[in-house]
Structures are given as C-alpha cells and as structure tokens.
C-alpha cells in the first residue's frame, strides 16, 4: 500500500513558518511506526524565514548593546564622581549581559536551522542542550535582576538621599553586580547537579528548563526536581519584576512630591516639572517593556507546572498545539527584551537624540561658513560627547546629594554641571 502525506497534521513550521519541518519528523515516525503517514518534505521558505528572523534579532541586539557599551565605557573613563560611575556600571553591565547572552545562543539556533537536522543529530551527547539552557537561564535572570538593582538604586537616590550619598560607592555597585551574576550562575547549575533538567523545546531548535515530567527515562525524583527548578525560575523572575515595578513607582512618587513642593513658578520649578515628566514616562516605558516581554513566559511556565505538562507533548501535535505555539512566542518576547534594553534605558532618550540633531546641524552649518563657527561646532560636539551623556545619566537615575547642614534633596541637572 502506497503511503500518503497528511498536510492537515503538518508541523508547525510548514503552517506558520517558524521552524524546519524535519526537526521533529523522525521522532514522530519512531513513536508511531505503524502510521503510514509520511512527514511533509522540508520547505526552503520555512527555513529561510526562520534563519532571517534569528539573524535579524542577533544583529539588532548586537548593534544596540554594542553602541550602549561604547557610550558608557567612554563616559565612565571621563567621570570622577563615584555616584555617577555607579549608574554607568549598571547600564554597561546590563548591555554586556544582553549582548553576550545573544551571541552565545543565536548562532546555535541559526546553525540548526541551516542544517535541516534534528537537535539530537547535532548534539547526541546532550551537552550542547545543557549549555544552551544554562545560558538562557543565566542571562535571562541576570537581566531581570540588574534591572531590579537599577530600580532600587533610583528609589534610594530619591527617597533616602542622605544614606545613598554616604554609602553608595562604586565598589558597592561592582560587588552587587558580580554577586547577582554569580548567584544566578549557581542557580542555573542546579540541573547539572541533578535538580531540574534542560530539555529540547518546541519546535526543536532550542533548549530550556523542563516544566513537567520528563521523558521515559525520568523517575519521580527527577520529575520533582524539574518542577522545583522551573517553579523557582518563574518565581524569581516574577519577584524581580515586582521589585522593579515597586521601586520605579516609588521613584515617580518621590519626584512628583518634590515637584509639587516648589511653591513658585521659577525656572527651577519648571525644570523639575520637565525632569519629572520625562523620567516618569521613561520609567513607565521600562515597566511596560519588562511586563510585555517577560510576563507571558513566566506566567505560562507556572501554568504548565500546575497542569503537570511540558512542551514534550508538542511532538505529537495534540489538541494542545496552541499552547506550544504560544510558549514559543513567549520565549521570543523574552529574547526581544535583550534587544530593547539599550534603547529603553539609553539610546532613545530625548536629550541624547536632541544632541545628535545638534551635532548634525553643526556639521551642516559648518560646511557653509568659515572661521566663526569652528568653536561653536567643537563645543556642540563636546556637549554631545560622553561628558554630557554622563550628566544625563544623573538625571536618568536621579542621583542626589545631601547638602551639608540642609535637609532637602539636591538634584544635579545638565545646566548646573
């Protein structure tokens, strides 16, 4: 009897152009040897779309984070104030974390797409899968915790300026950032020690934390470890989001209260109003980006844990296929956060964009005039350059200093630096 092809049960990639159709095909044939239905032939368009998507995300993330690291590093070398350097360290560490995380994972996905092979064929030992899952866990949680640390720093600077001015030093910032990274790394190594498991995820092009019972070779202890590790990851991620939201809201409240305390409509009062508005908008933007990118994945992981399911069932294309597709979208949203971070925190700030426009106008004006504009162009370039950017960071973080003998907050502004 001649075998036929069932296009109705075609893999996810064939229908939605997300993955190569041959990745799971061989495994389904092994699981159902009596089924005469053959998997659909590989689609070149499907593979090209997947590769283009992965390469676009990797290149975009690399460019944005590399630009942020360059600006921050130059600014850091020019700054003398310790409190100014603390916030620059946080920004630079976040950009470096996002960039390294993408560079370690995206090439693996691209190679797998281009090879048109199953993961097990390229990684028979499973070590690459463990490395991939560990990398996603480390750099994913690190980004969330660094964002939380930055939110805590902003809240302390505005609500406890005296304590912040006397205790917050560059060495403390370095220790906190290094401690965060080491703690997350230790947590991510738990599956290597037997607590939890990194498994191949739908549609077979990446590895991540297993959220439910493993394969046929897992016992009850391993299943318990999977549940514990996946639950801990989701709870830690959601806790980081809650801390970030709470601290950002506290910062906004402190700024609004300080703005209202200005009794007169002086220039200082107008400046405070502008700073408060711009900062509140940016902090709300940060909260929106974090919630949209991370909440779907973390909440869905908890849902799958409570339902005792995992993406292992996606291989058979059951009635839960929509859940598999949504899980893939949730992971891609989390990956998108690594691309958006440098733009939300730094590159799309109004002040920086205005300075770039001034620089462009300065170059254009200098082409048509002589002599008298050289000093002006040079001054604009210097203002645009990193020294002015560092002052802007102080506005962004709302670093404060307590004046000796006075009980009010003193805010560094661009005009007074």
Swiss-Prot record:
Keywords: Cell membrane, G-protein coupled receptor, Glycoprotein, Lipoprotein, Membrane, Palmitate, Receptor, Transducer, Transmembrane, Transmembrane helix. PROSITE patterns: G_PROTEIN_RECEP_F1_2. GO terms for molecular function: prostaglandin E receptor activity. PANTHER family: G-PROTEIN COUPLED RECEPTOR FAMILY 1 MEMBER, PROSTAGLANDIN E2 RECEPTOR EP3 SUBTYPE. Belongs to the G-protein coupled receptor 1 family. Residues 78-90, 153-174, 253-282, 349-417 are cytoplasmic. It is found in: Cell membrane. Glycans are attached at residues 17, 35, 216, 307. GO terms for biological process: adenylate cyclase-activating G protein-coupled receptor signaling pathway; inflammatory response; intestine smooth muscle contraction; negative regulation of gastric acid secretion; phospholipase C-activating G protein-coupled receptor signaling pathway; positive regulation of cytosolic calcium ion concentration. It comes from the Eukaryota. Its main location: membrane. GO terms for cellular component: plasma membrane. It holds the Pfam family 7tm_1. This is Prostaglandin E2 receptor EP3 subtype. Receptor for prostaglandin E2 (PGE2). The various isoforms have identical ligand binding properties but interact with different second messenger systems: isoform EP3A couples to G(i)/G(o) proteins; isoform EP3B and isoform EP3C couple to G(s), and isoform EP3D couples to G(i), G(s) and G(p). Required for normal development of fever in response to pyrinogens, including IL1B, prostaglandin E2 and bacterial lipopolysaccharide (LPS). Required for normal potentiation of platelet aggregation by prostaglandin E2, and thus plays a role in the regulation of blood coagulation. It is a multi-pass membrane protein. InterPro entries: EP3_rcpt_1 (IPR003304), GPCR_Rhodpsn (IPR000276), GPCR_Rhodpsn_7TM (IPR017452), Prostanoid_rcpt (IPR008365), Prostglndn_DP_rcpt (IPR001244), Prostglndn_EP3_rcpt (IPR000265). It comes from Bos taurus (Bovine). The gene is PTGER3. Residues 1-52, 112-130, 197-226, 307-326 are extracellular. The keyword Oxidoreductase does not apply. Interacts (via C-terminus) with MKLN1. The chain crosses the membrane at residues 53-77, 91-111, 131-152, 175-196, 227-252, 283-306, 327-348.
